[in-house]
Regions:
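A short, charged, amphipathic alpha-helix used as a generic interaction element across diverse proteins
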Residues: 43-56
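Short, Arg/Lys-rich segments that mark the N-terminal edge of DNA/RNA- and chromatin-recognition modules
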Residues: 1-40, 45, 60, 66-71
Length: 71
């Protein structure tokens, strides 16, 4: 899947955060309906790089959860 990675980036008090909704089919594994992580940077370029990495890891993790559910 291809997403606009910048749509997962928010700025709070000058620091970038990654915020992404948890898909409905894996929500039972989470306490919240969103994943929110401070990227600990004030650089937009660094934030985009980090957000892409986190987003890919989440996609892979969620894919694994979906595969386990099929068993």
């Amino acid at each position: 899947m291809t997403y606009n990675q910048s749509s997962y980036i928010r700025v709070r008090f000058g620091v970038y955060h990654f915020v992404r909704r948890v898909p409905a089919d894996v929500k039972q594994h989470y306490r919240s309906d969103r994943v929110s992580i401070s990227l600990r940077t004030k650089s937009a370029k660094a934030a985009i790089r980090s957000a892409q990495s986190i987003s890919q890891r989440l996609d892979d993790y969620w894919h694994g959860l979906r595969l386990q559910k099929m068993d």
